[in-house]
A protein has these predicted regions:
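Active-site neighborhoods and metal-handling regions in enzymes and metal-associated proteins
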Residues: 1-248
Length: 248
């Protein structure tokens, strides 16, 4: 069941989302060759706690960290670690903050120093996919209008769209309805209504969209071990159009 939020509830979610946005604003200039994802983890957790919020993923279904840190061929749910990032890497940092019982969720892919033209194109197209999806997130449209725009743009640029990891509604729970992949057909899927709050988070791959899960039960990698990128915002549907609650 899709839970529609009041304006008051949307503002409460926005406060949690802005904690997450501050994490990303703070870390962006710090991501350079030599930094570790453990260090990024500490920066994010410190900011979340400073605001009186909680790092929601820490302890979620046994997950042990405040962030997911996904490097190069890791699509999502990578663990922070002590290995320094290297020139040419790309890294996606995803975090969820809980503030006063409401959740905010955002992921962003960062370049580590100078990256390859392929990685640059992948990051650019993935961000464009996010923007195209948001543009279709209007009351009266359907989820398929968003996802088809994302899929068409990614595939027309020669990239894959991950099917097995989903975007989701969000509020007091992390995974509310609708849960949906970033592929589809225009005019299909649930109708978008004012008061809906959900993520748009395309995961785009250099090669195949197919993936594997590491033995740790979490880390999702591209099957062909080529690069993956992701950009995620939490948005609210209003009479005026989509509002980006995690705007940085």
């Amino acid at each position: 069941m899709i839970i529609l939020k009041s304006q008051h509830e949307i503002e409460a979610i926005r406060k949690a989302c802005q904690v997450v946005a501050e994490c990303h604003r703070t870390i962006a200039p710090l991501i350079q060759p030599g930094i570790t994802t453990n260090e990024i983890e500490r920066v994010f957790e410190d900011i979340i706690l400073k605001h009186g919020a909680k790092p929601y993923t820490k302890g979620y279904k046994g997950y042990r960290y405040a962030t997911c840190a996904s490097v190069n061929d890791v699509i999502a749910h990578g663990f922070p670690g002590s290995k320094p990032l290297e020139e040419g890497d790309i890294v996606t940092i995803d975090t969820v903050a809980e503030l006063d019982g409401w959740l905010g969720d955002s992921a962003w892919t960062y370049a580590v120093g100078k990256i390859s033209p392929t990685a640059e194109k992948l990051m650019r197209v993935t961000k464009e996919c996010l923007d195209l999806g948001i543009a279709q997130a209007r009351s009266g449209n359907r989820i398929g209008d968003m996802t088809s725009a994302i899929q068409q743009h990614a595939e027309s640029n020669g990239f894959g769209v991950v099917r097995d990891l989903l975007a989701h509604g969000i509020g007091r729970d992390l995974h509310e309805d609708p849960n949906y992949p970033h592929v589809g057909q225009p005019g299909k899927g649930p109708r978008i209504k004012e008061g809906m709050v959900f993520t748009i988070e395309p995961m785009i791959t250099e090669g195949t969209y197919r993936m594997t899960i590491d033995d740790d039960g979490w880390t999702a990698r591209t099957l062909d071990r080529k690069l993956a990128a992701q950009y995620e915002h939490t948005i609210a549907i209003t009479a005026e159009g989509p509002q980006i609650l995690t705007l940085q």
